[in-house]
Amino acid sequence: VVAFIPVLIINQFVFDWDFRNRPPYPNVINLTTNLGMLVGTIWVTYITVRGEKRKLSSLFIIPLWKDFLKGFGFGTMFMIVFMIITQSFGIIRFELADFSKQFYFDFFFFLMIAVIEEIVSRGHILSILKEKYSDFISLLVSSVIFGLFHLGNDHVTVIGLSTITASGFLMGLITLRTGSISMAVGLHWAWNFVQGAILGLCVSGQDQVGIFAPQFLSSALLTGGDFGAEGSLIMLVITILVLILVYRFWLKIFGVRLKDQSDNAQV
């Protein structure tokens, strides 16, 4: 955990970047920073595995590409449902905007963020807690820690932290059920990418340029305001409902069993 402190500090620095007042070549700077964070995360993981003589699978690091794609579709669904509800009830109006090349940068930027945060939150923290505590306690504590990672973000709200914590619990549950962070990475990536690069909403307090330009027609309590969809009471309710459904009807929704993972794993 101590070894990850520099990684988390850099992560906070990156998300505190003012994306509307970008200096020259900001994408190169940000991608390079994220790449450095990713390398640092992989290095700490290597030290952990090597030093403690563990397998990557003990940290839920098992590449399962089908699960990854399912997770991406799952994360996309969250934002589509949010868009449909807010558009239908006149809460947010989504208008097409001019296409920006920023879209391509965000594609890789949010992918790296998803990989880094899932390795740290679910791969390391959840797996460590799982060794000593029950599934519920491990999920609860790791998801709260995941939420607190975003405490220093701009425009943070109680609802925003609650939604992020609930989503962390969901991704942790998915990780325990599949034995891999693959689906959680896909979900995490789509959650941020679709929210920011497509819908044009802020992502955890950071301004984004998307394919759509959202116009807020209601209070921040419903729109999420400057924090993004996570700051919306609507998204919090959606996340909690989906979490309950996934817990109750896992096999019917995903058709994935823990015992099947050895057949799908590609290490």
List where the protein language model places each region.
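Small-polar-interrupted transmembrane alpha-helices in polytopic inner-membrane proteins
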Residues: 79-80, 110, 114, 134-151, ...
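Functionally important transmembrane alpha-helices
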Residues: 5-9, 160-220
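C-terminal membrane module of polytopic membrane proteins
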Residues: 194-267
